[in-house]
Amino acid sequence: MASLNDICYEKIKDNFYYGLFRDFKLVVDKNTECFNATKLCNSGGKQFRQWTRLEKSKKLMEYYSRRGSQQMYEIKGDNKDQLVTQTTGTYAPIDFFEDIKRWIQLPKASSASGVVYVVTTSILQVHNVFKIGYTKNFEERLKTFNDYRHSLEPQFFAVAIYDTDNAKKLETTIHKKLKDFRSEGEFFQVELSVIKEAFLKEDCCLKDLDYEEDHSNSFTDLNDKLKTLNII
C-alpha cells in the first residue's frame, strides 16, 4: 500500500472517503492521507481522548513530532448534518494506526475498572463540599446513599463521573492530590474546578452529565451542617 488513499472505496463528501484497512473501516482524508482516529476508537467502544492520555501514547506522539512527521489535526463541524458527523474528529497519520488498533482491541472492562464519582447535595455545594469515591455501579451506589438518607433532604447527586480502568487507584490518587482540602473521610471542601483540574492528567474519561447548580439551601456553619447530615 503506497498510501491510505489506495484503500478508499466510497466517497462521503468532498475529500473524505471510507476505506478498508486490515479489516477496519476507516474515514480517510484524501488531502492529507490521514485517518479519523476518533471514529476508529468509537468503533471499538472507546474514546480517542482516553488513548491520548496514556503515557505510551504521549511518548509516541512526541517521537513522531521530533521526527518532523505530519501532526494530528481536528475536523469540526455541525453534527446535526449527517454527512458532517461522519467526518468530524481527530485525524492521524497511518504511523499511529497499529498502536491505536491494539489499544481498542484490549478488553474494555477488567476487575479493576469502574468509575470515580464526585457527588454533593444542594446544601453541601453551597459550601463547596463534595464526596469523592469509586464504584463499579454508580447508579446502585447513589441509590444506596440516598436510601440511607431517605428521611433527610436534600439527596446526593453527581456533578462529575470519570470512567477508568483502575478505579481504586484513581480514587487514591485524587484523594492524595486533594488531601489539603479533606473535610472528613471522602468529603472535601474545595471548588469543583479544582477537583476537575486534579483529574485532567489522569487516565480517565469524563462522562457527560446534565448538571445545573442549585444554591437554594444553605447552612451558616459548615460543621453543624455536616453533623446534621450524619457526615461527621
Curated annotation (Swiss-Prot):
KilA-N domain span: 15-119
PROSITE patterns tied to this protein: KILA_N
Protein name from the UniProt record: Putative KilA-N domain-containing protein 315L
Organism: Invertebrate iridescent virus 6 (IIV-6)
